[in-house]
Design a protein with these regions (language model features):
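Flexible glycine/proline-enriched surface loops and loop-helix/loop-strand junctions
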Residues: 97-100, 168, 191-196, 206-208, ...
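Short, charged, amphipathic alpha-helices and their helix-cap/turn boundaries
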Residues: 87-92, 134, 169-196, 220-240
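Active-site helix/loop module of the DD-peptidase/beta-lactamase fold
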Residues: 123-161, 189, 216-254, 258
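Active-site Gly/Thr loop motif
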Residues: 237-240, 288-335, 343
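Non-transmembrane alpha-helical segments in soluble domains
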Residues: 118, 134, 151-154, 184, ...
Length: 364
């Protein structure tokens, strides 16, 4: 009898060890999320995929601007960059920060999606924002979630549940979306909490589903869509996108590591109506479309929060420790990197009457 019990115990312990080893990337990331205590981990471990920069990136003349020091010289701010579509970027940095050193964009990663869909639309004759995703996602072809459209996903009106985040629950789609082992499968398991298009509720699944749709539109997957249509046409440095497993799917909802200057370039592309030099990346009118409030949330547009006024809207991408503000009217963007909440005065830097052109600049 004791021998039987011992054998059963040995088998069960072996199975437990095997399961732990097989899902080690999940448990490793889950521990990092848990240790962050509701904040953002300093860096998530695991495999990554390189996104290559453009041979002709959005040009910027970079200058360290002493006018920013009195504003930014607090204990919470690490980097502050102000960019103008005319081609200059003023910055202030704490001694430990570098405008060229990649940072985890955290939730800024999802800010790539609205301009990416514009870039994809620019290559197509049919309108893609209002096409039900069932046309492109076989998994939802016969599912009620197949009625969701990319526009609703960008508006955070898909109806998909936000989900409770319990990092150590390996059976939770929400935990799997954060830690793997399959980001896309996890997003496709997000349940409907509301009829599509009826309710505003941010869900991390929205970004990941959008990545699947973008990949299907491109025909070669999300990584190729992002590389070929957006990042590889504007960025000055490599970026590292987090993968769920080796040679797996990119996390569209978080965690891409890129240089602060390239996050600013994203803002300036939008601020300049989707144009780099003489090349149009986004269709005419797409940026204006991004500034239109959703039917149920007046402070949320296409993939971005909205501030400012109807005549002079400001697009915002806000995530813990990161804030990207974009003014299409002023043709400016401001990136803040720090700890805690961003300062209230940041958007003043978008206004030419308050913050003018730097006197000296150098290539950056």
């Amino acid at each position: 009898m004791l021998v039987t019990v011992a054998v059963i115990a040995l088998v069960l312990s072996s199975l437990a060890v095997g399961a732990l080893a097989a899902h080690w990337p999940f448990w490793h990331r889950a521990w990092q999320w848990q240790s962050a205590a509701g904040q953002w981990p300093a860096q998530l471990s695991g495999p990554t995929q390189v996104l290559s920069p453009s041979a002709t990136p959005l040009p910027l003349r970079l200058v360290a601007d002493s006018r920013l020091a009195p504003r930014a010289g607090d204990a919470l701010t690490q980097l502050l960059l102000v960019g103008d579509a005319s081609g200059w970027a003023a910055y202030w940095s704490a001694p430990s920060a570098d405008v060229h050193a990649p940072i985890d964009g955290r939730g800024l990663s999802s800010a790539l999606l609205a301009p990416l869909f514009g870039a994809l639309q620019h290559t197509m004759t049919r309108a893609v924002l209002d096409e039900p995703v069932r046309m492109l996602l076989d998994e939802w072809r016969e599912d009620a979630r197949g009625e969701i459209t990319p526009r609703q996903l960008l508006w955070e009106m898909s109806g998909l549940a936000e989900g409770e985040f319990v990092p150590f629950n390996p059976f939770s789609w929400r935990a799997q979306l954060a830690s793997g082992p399959d980001f896309s499968r996890a997003a496709l398991h997000a349940p409907l909490a509301w009829p599509p298009g009826s309710h505003f509720e941010p869900s991390p699944a929205n970004a990941q589903v959008l990545s699947l749709v973008a990949g299907a539109l491109d025909g070669k997957g999300f990584a190729n869509a992002l590389q070929r249509n957006l990042w590889g046409r504007m960025a000055g440095q490599e970026a590292l996108a987090l993968l769920d497993h080796p040679r797996g799917s990119i996390a569209a909802h978080c965690c891409m590591r890129a240089a602060p200057l390239d996050w600013l370039r994203l803002g300036l592309l939008i601020a300049n109506d989707g144009v780099i030099g003489r090349e149009r990346l986004l269709p005419e009118g797409h940026v204006a479309l991004m500034t239109v409030a959703s039917p149920v949330h007046p402070a949320y547009g296409l993939g971005y929060s909205l501030a400012g006024t109807q005549a002079a809207p400001v697009l915002l991408a806000v995530t813990p420790g990161r804030r990207l503000a974009i003014s299409p009217r002023e043709r400016r963007a401001v990136l803040w990197v720090g700890e805690g909440h961003a300062p209230e005065w940041l958007d003043e830097l978008l206004l030419r009457g308050i913050f003018g052109t730097p006197d000296n600049s150098s290539g950056g």
